Amino acid sequence: MDLQAQLEELKTKTLETLQSLTGNHTKELQDLRVAVLGKKGSLTELLKGLKDLSNDLRPVVGKQVNEVRDLLTKAFEEQAKIVEAAKIQAQLDAESIDVTLPGRQMTLGHRHVLTQTSEEIEDIFLGMGFQIVDGFEVEKDYYNFERMNLPKDHPARDMQDTFYITEEILLRTHTSPVQARTLDQHDFSKGPLKMVSPGRVFRRDTDDATHSHQFHQIEGLVVGKNISMGDLKGTLEMIIKKMFGEERSIRLRPSYFPFTEPSVEVDVSCFKCGGKGCNVCKKTGWIEILGAGMVHPSVLEMSGVDAKEYSGFAFGLGQERIAMLRYGINDIRGFYQGDQRFSEQFN
């Protein structure tokens, strides 16, 4: 077969093969292009035969070679567009969404257990005549520490690692600053002050099963004439019974807080074993629940309240602590991980 006939045969077979590659055949198309037009392809091999042609025939066949190469090059380009379109269509078909199918049912959210606990506690205090007072999470060092009888050189400041924003501005470590601000504004000629302040507080602590760098407190304050430790105990007994059941009892143990004098730790009788001793109460029959005490005279005096005429008590409890005890939760981190499986248990 002469060279011209071989060129025509190569052109015809290549075009026929190209027309068959109409689907997602990117690799096959590339392989064919290399086999025909590549440096070691069929057309290149045929070009080597030009040297054996006569001087008269060589220009004619050379022109035919160029025409075949140009034709096949254009044919490969056009077929590449067809193959790419087929590839895109195949991808669209594979990823298409049937809009007639019913949608996925929306998952219902649940009120967070801490929200439930906070509202229950607030309702108890509202029923006892307390007012709910909100405060600032970003607070002045003055109100967070100094007004709580913790001057700058007081060693008890080491009890609380603090997130400082500036030397005088911080994230509050307790909700006690609200008590100081409310004391400043209260008009005692209209009666005693009875308030609770719920809110989030922050301490530089390493997160683990029982500690968190942020948590929630509810602190209470009662200031008036002739307020005694007996009033504190009676108030706490009523709160504990409403939260944990009428059969619960409390005990007060001496403690120390800079802003109260005297200060006490409050324990509740174990609600699992009834005071007999178990793993929850560590065989003691009692569970530590909150801290409290009579308001320190210095705290009253700094608000312009005559400590000789007025007295009061304060207490603070943690919402996470209450919720963990009530619901048997053993890891505080569960409150903050946003796991719906955790939240829906308390719906």
Swiss-Prot record:
Provide the cofactor list for this protein: Mg(2+)
Please give the biological process terms from Gene Ontology that the record holds.
Answer: phenylalanyl-tRNA aminoacylation
Supply the name of the protein: Phenylalanine--tRNA ligase alpha subunit
Instruction: Provide the primary localization.
Output: cytoplasm
Reaction(s) catalysed by this chain's protein = tRNA(Phe) + L-phenylalanine + ATP = L-phenylalanyl-tRNA(Phe) + AMP + diphosphate + H(+)
Localization annotation: Cytoplasm
What is written in the cofactor note of this entry?
Binds 2 magnesium ions per tetramer.
Q: Which GO terms describe its molecular function?
A: ATP binding; catalytic activity, acting on a protein; magnesium ion binding; phenylalanine-tRNA ligase activity; transferase activity; tRNA binding
Sorted alphabetically, the keyword list is: Aminoacyl-tRNA synthetase, ATP-binding, Cytoplasm, Ligase, Magnesium, Metal-binding, Nucleotide-binding, Protein biosynthesis
Q: Recorded E.C. number(s)?
A: 6.1.1.20
Q: Which domain of life is it from?
A: Bacteria
Q: Which GO terms describe its cellular component?
A: cytoplasm
**TM stretches of this protein:** none
Q: Which InterPro entries match?
A: aa-tRNA-synth_II, aa-tRNA-synth_II/BPL/LPL, Phe-tRNA-synth_IIc_asu, Phe-tRNA_ligase_II_N, Phe_tRNA_ligase_alpha1_bac, Phenylalanyl-tRNA_Synthase, tRNA-bd_arm
Its family remark reads: Belongs to the class-II aminoacyl-tRNA synthetase family. Phe-tRNA synthetase alpha subunit type 1 subfamily.
An example of a Pfam family matching this protein is Phe_tRNA-synt_N
